[in-house]
Amino acid sequence: MASSALAVSVAKPAASPPVAVAAVTPQRRLLPQCRGVRAAPVVRLRSGRARGVSVVCAAQGQETSFQVPDVTKSTWQSLVVESELPVLVEFWASWCGPCKMIDPVIGKLSKEYEGKLNCYKLNTDENPDIATQFGIRSIPTMMIFKNGEKKDAVIGAVPESTLVSSIDKYIGR
């Protein structure tokens, strides 16, 4: 048997930065009330993990939400208990992701039900006494009060239709 020697010539690779960037073609998706999506490429780190696509939404300049006023321990009695209208209170915290998701819905409902329903937000981190008084264990929690009494509660970032059906029971639409 003849022995054959195979000589392989390998070029020495040039020095590269520690992070290699993989080229990606971003998909263009439209989000509601946005001009479009700008995507960042996927970046592969040495650990093998990848960062996802970064989505940036640019509002089209129209008013997208209504600022819901805050209620605190000091204003609770006058704004909620003594209100002549039914009151929707959103119990929330600044660090809560689902609270941020439901916030625009509460703002929209506040605007739609203006004159029929008062809407307020209560920060549970800043007002733990009231949150404890009403047994708040999950946020966001939306409670409806009528004549100063708790009538209904909806827990979690629910669809707008769920909140509307709860509200409509107490405002006589």
UniProtKB/Swiss-Prot annotation:
Domain named Thioredoxin: residues: 58-172
Site (Contributes to redox potential value): 97-98
Location(s), subcellular: Plastid, Chloroplast
InterPro entries: Thioredoxin, Thioredoxin-like_sf, Thioredoxin_CS, Thioredoxin_domain
Intrachain S-S bonds: 96-99
Keyword list, A-Z: Chloroplast, Disulfide bond, Electron transport, Plastid, Redox-active center, Transit peptide, Transport
Main localisation: plastid
One Pfam family, short name: Thioredoxin
One example GO MF annotation: protein-disulfide reductase activity
Highest taxon, organism lineage: Eukaryota
GO cellular component entries: chloroplast; cytoplasm
SUPFAM superfamilies for this protein: Thioredoxin-like
Transit peptide: first to last position: 1-57
Annotated active site: 96 (nucleophile), 99 (nucleophile)
Record-linked Gene3D superfamilies: Glutaredoxin (3.40.30.10)
Family affiliation: Belongs to the thioredoxin family. Plant M-type subfamily.
Function: Probable thiol-disulfide oxidoreductase that may be involved in the redox regulation of chloroplastic enzymes.
Name recorded for this polypeptide: Thioredoxin M1, chloroplastic
Native source organism of the sequence: Oryza sativa subsp. japonica
